[in-house]
């Protein structure tokens, strides 16, 4: 369970920070000071991300639990990465299906959240041989 919580927290905290930097500095050419002043928006993004990802992370935990002791750590991480990537896309699709057909800032959101969850899967140690979860 700790593995899933680490990935969840990593994704919902790091993704908004990366989004603020990428959207603010690179795309909108904002100053670093104005990016730092948007902490309220980042906080709201963390809360909304937490709430909207609950169903996906429950399924993530169930998949991880199913994979425990049945597959190697490498295979489990590949499966969890694929699910994590797809779960982000599905969640955003439920909110706004139009982001797929048009390139927008929301598409960047999906890419960053997807990559962040995959990075989390591979960064944190997943011990499939744990006795308790």
Q: Model features per residue range: what roles?
A:
Residues 1-133:
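Juxtamembrane/disordered regions of integral membrane proteins
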């Amino acid at each position: 369970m700790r593995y899933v919580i680490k990935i969840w927290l990593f994704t919902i905290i790091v993704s908004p920070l990366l989004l603020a930097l990428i959207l603010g500095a690179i795309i909108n050419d904002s100053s670093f000071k104005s990016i730092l002043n948007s902490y309220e928006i980042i906080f709201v993004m963390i809360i909304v991300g937490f709430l909207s990802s609950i169903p996906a992370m429950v399924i993530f935990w169930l998949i991880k639990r199913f994979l425990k002791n049945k597959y190697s750590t490498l295979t489990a991480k590949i499966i969890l990465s694929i699910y994590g990537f797809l779960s982000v896309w599905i969640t955003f699709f439920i909110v706004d299906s139009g982001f797929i057909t048009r390139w927008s800032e929301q598409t960047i959101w999906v890419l960053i959240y997807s990559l962040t969850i995959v990075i989390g899967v591979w960064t944190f140690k997943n011990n499939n041989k744990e006795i308790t979860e």
